Amino acid sequence: MKIIIHYALILFFTFVNSAFSESKYHHMPHGKFRNPEGSPVRDPNFKWSYKTFNEEKKKIKISIPTDHVVPKNQVLENINKLKNEDYILWIGHATFLIKLGDNMIITDPVFEKNMGPLIFGPKRYVDPAIDLKNLPKINYFLQTHNHYDHLSTRTIKNFPFKNTEVLMPLRLSKHFEKNNYKKIIELDWYDQKKYTDITFTFLPSIHWSKRSLWDTNKSLWGSFLIEYKDKKILFLCDTGYGKIYKELGKKYGPIDITFINIGAYNFFPMAPKKDSSIYHTNPEEALQIGRDLNSKKLVGMHWGTVVLSLEPIMEPAQRFKKNASKFGYNENDATLFKIGEAKKISELIK
């Protein structure tokens, strides 16, 4: 594990490298990474086309239900009301606040209107639930991978808490170093970082990395297992479905709450069939991962914010709820948030 630490308080923490196996299958020659052994591979008949994608994207109706978003002033009021509670708040897409005791965690923060380089890339149809300047003090910044809808250099530059602990996959530190972050920690799969009352373990996911024409899979991707007191929370985004999750379930389950992507799965007609993305689970695959992990609760994310694929914008949530019972979950176990909504963890885990 490569650790870049620019501060002197290291004695307060312990660092543990807990390898899941002796092999490093995901480390490839020439400095690239790959998915866990036995993961699905892209259908050779998948033919990406910006022209086709943009033509099909224009057919998607952006109709936002009135109850999909909590007003910003109410979001701030709720944060203040819950200051003595543990809670989860959805800012949008893959960005959440997770409060556990005195620990405030933010995941994959992106606060810009468009999720791409400069002024390019897909544009949000729902703004972030809170402005960057109004964030509560953040103790831990979790970065899962480098795609533009998860890693924003503008958010990193303007983030108000440069002294926060930033945990990320291998080879992502440059984005933070040049913006003068003080506590930067790169993790390989199965590496663990322990603090006084909270532990983070970086685990595999089935995905990829890319920000330019020249850096495909040159940085790692993954998920974060958060352990606090007797709770286990897994932030799993982005991922496709694969056998690795049964293995992780045996090793780390049961999980109390798993955050998982339920949108961005349909690329037909470029893909030979619908719902066939190997890098983003459809709602049913997300529910199956929950079963494989022995996760008590699921939180659906990566939907309802920006158009990244070709399914109707509310379809992921509808299918997630509709099919939950087929995988042994009731509607309360397969949880969805409004953008800006905060829920007490004590009410999620009963």
Located regions from the model:
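Active-site metal-binding motif and surrounding structural segment of the metallo-beta-lactamase
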Residues: 120-168, 253-259
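Active-site metal-binding loops of divalent metal-dependent hydrolases
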Residues: 109-111, 146, 205-206, 237-239, ...
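Metallo-beta-lactamase
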Residues: 18-134, 168-237, 256-262, 321-341, 345-349
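Acidic/histidine-rich helix-loop elements
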Residues: 111-128, 208-216, 266-280
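Divalent metal-coordination and catalytic microenvironments
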Residues: 98, 108, 145, 152, ...
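Cap/insert and terminal regions of metallo-dependent hydrolase folds
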Residues: 22-28, 33-36, 140, 165-167, ...
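Sec-dependent signal peptide recognition
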Residues: 2-10
